[in-house]
């Protein structure tokens, strides 16, 4: 019997192996039967592959080159015409999973100059949100600083904006995804936001920021844990 962590890795390896075949040559993702394609799926795929690489150090899975697959997904996501902070945020974290700087990143080395320039432009676009999309702004800020697009790290301020939104829009300290609605929306995206922000901070080149910001974030995230049944 394998220990729990080994079982988790085996499951991740199996799931990823079954899904990599659906990534096309151009980095787009073929949807499952009955589902519609999403503009952010290439970015999601890039992060899934990147997290697997971080956990295992493996650069191949079956016949698939993980560096090449990730580069294709990032390229596809970078050139999506629709506004998609979601996809860009996921793609940038997927890229960071292979190295915390451009100079030591095997996937970045495989990107063509037009893709690099387009990705830089996407990351430099700053947006503020009142819902879970603020978590994507945090991830983009992490990538901006880590990839050297800015010398000043504004991630702390973007996180503060996220926390202020929670405190302003929910008396119970939960993420309200519809602060302008009559009753608000409190769903799984609130919990997802904290997981995503934690993931972003783990990949941040500014390692001290995580120690400063996690305690405050944890006080809100623990509210969700208390809701889980014993």
Residue ranges and their predicted role:
Residues 34-56, 63-221, 227-230:
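Aromatic-lined, polymer-binding surfaces characteristic
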Residues 1-44, 48-51:
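Low-complexity, Ser/Thr/Pro/Gly-enriched N-terminal "stalk/linker" regions
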């Amino acid at each position: 019997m394998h220990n729990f962590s080994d079982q988790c890795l085996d499951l991740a390896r199996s799931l990823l192996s079954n899904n990599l075949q659906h990534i096309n040559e151009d980095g787009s993702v073929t949807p499952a039967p009955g589902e519609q394609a999403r503009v952010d799926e290439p970015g999601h795929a890039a992060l899934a592959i990147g997290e697997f690489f971080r956990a295992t150090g493996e650069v191949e899975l079956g016949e698939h080159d993980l560096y090449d697959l990730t580069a294709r997904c990032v390229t596809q996501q970078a050139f999506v015409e629709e506004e998609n902070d979601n996809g860009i945020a996921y793609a940038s974290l997927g890229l960071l999973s292979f190295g915390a700087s451009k100079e030591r990143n095997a996937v970045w080395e495989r990107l063509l100059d037009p893709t690099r320039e387009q990705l830089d432009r996407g990351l430099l676009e700053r947006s503020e949100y009142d819902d879970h999309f603020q978590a994507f702004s945090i991830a983009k800020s992490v990538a901006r600083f880590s990839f050297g697009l800015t010398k000043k790290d504004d991630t702390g301020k973007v996180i503060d904006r996220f926390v202020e939104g929670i405190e302003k829009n929910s008396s119970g300290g939960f993420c309200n995804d519809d602060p302008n609605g009559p009753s608000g929306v409190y769903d799984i995206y609130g919990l997802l936001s904290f997981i995503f922000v934690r993931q972003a901070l783990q990949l941040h080149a500014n390692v001290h920021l995580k120690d400063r910001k996690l305690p405050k974030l944890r006080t809100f995230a623990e509210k969700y844990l208390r809701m889980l049944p014993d």
